Curated annotation (Swiss-Prot):
GO terms for cellular component: extracellular region. The modification Phenylalanine amide is found at residue 7. Increases the rate and amplitude of spontaneous contractions of semi-isolated hearts. Increases the amplitude of excitatory postsynaptic potentials in abdominal extensor muscle. It comes from Procambarus clarkii (Red swamp crayfish). This is Cardio-excitatory FMRFamide homolog DF2. It is found in: Secreted. The lineage of its organism: Eukaryota, Metazoa, Ecdysozoa, Arthropoda, Crustacea.
Length: 7
C-alpha cells in the first residue's frame, strides 16, 4: 500500500 495512498 506504500505506493499510491499511504506513503
Amino acid at each position: 500500500d506504500r505506493n499510491f495512498l499511504r506513503f
